[in-house]
């Protein structure tokens, strides 16, 4: 079901990750995502796996929720694996007709697929452990230095957060429309891929209408609360780095340093 997709949802809690400064969480997430692409051997992926699982345990977020964030993208993961397996030249381990699978292709395909899994899973922890309001404040604070160049930091942060928050809302709306049309005899499951795609076309009009209606309701609610952008806006909670943020930065930098060392060691 579309409602099983958890991207953009917040999981309330009081864990170490929940209490971190949003700026620290965003920066640590970006650093670790970049570090994932340094993994080029089984030992590196073992370290990435241990670190990711450790963060999931510390966050208090059920592992099944992290899996739900990865599961909807299984088509992309399988496609990525097949592309590498079937197109990478090297020592052949299987061949049949025009299909040739090499040892290098299998390794590269598995590594790239694992990178995507860790990237999606670790990124989902950011939204699971950070409420939309706090996430907006964190993004705005990180973009503030660019305001001198004319970058509207608050407006960009607000748009990004609203877009992320609307993903589960639109998926829920799509699921509701599909159920309503199925009760009237519509069939979204039978037929080939093209027929299923054509069957989704009638969903577009009511979905767009519902999306614009929700956007209008949100705009009305923001105006009713006298929202006028970031100028002169005060915050109930002031952002401040604490010892837990410094500990998180230290841990992420250590993991990145180890991955970088293993990258050059196994590369040679």
Predicted regions and their residues:
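Alpha-helical transmembrane segments and their helix-start/interface "positive-inside/aromatic belt" motifs
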Residues: 25, 64-74, 248
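Transmembrane alpha-helix interface motif
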Residues: 1-44, 48-57, 141-144, 148-151, ...
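Alpha-helical transmembrane segments and their membrane-interface exit regions
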Residues: 51-61, 76-79
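Juxtamembrane/interface alpha-helical elements of multi-pass membrane proteins
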Residues: 73-186
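Loop-to-transmembrane-helix entry motif
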Residues: 69-77, 113, 117, 207, ...
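Membrane-helix interfacial "entry" motifs
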Residues: 14, 37, 60-65, 96, ...
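Transmembrane helix-loop junctions in multipass membrane proteins, especially transporters and channels
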Residues: 41, 45, 60-64, 88-96, ...
